[in-house]
Amino acid sequence: MKTLDKITNYDLFDFADEFLKFVPVFRPNPTVTCLFGNPLTNLLVNGTGAACFFEFCSLALIKVSKILLDLLLLALLIDSENELCFEIDGDWLCVLGFGEGDLEVGRSLGMALPDDDVLLSITFWFLCNSSFSILFVFELRIFLRTVNNLLVVFLSVLKRNDL
């Protein structure tokens, strides 16, 4: 990613507080079903199904962050052509594509990767299917900056150590 140097620093420890500010206005795709947490939190609003609310606790944040960080690490280990990052109106959109074989590599390394046929909608969507690639669309701009900052730190460590 050639434009990582443009991203401003963001304190990772403030992420949870910032996320909670965005939750009331977060509107995922109506066709996406929330499968994370208590099923009772999968609600339809005004009969439109345009919003999905869930119980978001620190345990959920840790679990999701672990999966995300492992997948980002896997993206750095495999073919870099699978990684696309671009900027739209100041917001970062990252799409990472992985094939089924790439997932097996990650699992063999002990990464906490999701099982096949899992669909989650939290702060981002990711689709994992045995016959397609994984598609990640990160929705919150604060989340995008945090993720990219993690990559900046990771890449700078690699560069400093000539890895």
UniProtKB/Swiss-Prot annotation:
Keywords: Membrane, Transmembrane, Transmembrane helix. Residues 1-33, 139-163 are cytoplasmic. One of its GO terms (cellular component) is membrane. It is a multi-pass membrane protein. It comes from the Eukaryota. The keyword Transmembrane helix applies. It is found in: Membrane. Its main location: membrane. Residues 55-117 are extracellular. The chain crosses the membrane at residues 34-54, 118-138. The keyword Ribonucleoprotein does not apply. Coiled coil: none annotated. Partially overlaps YOL100W. This is Putative uncharacterized membrane protein YOL099C.
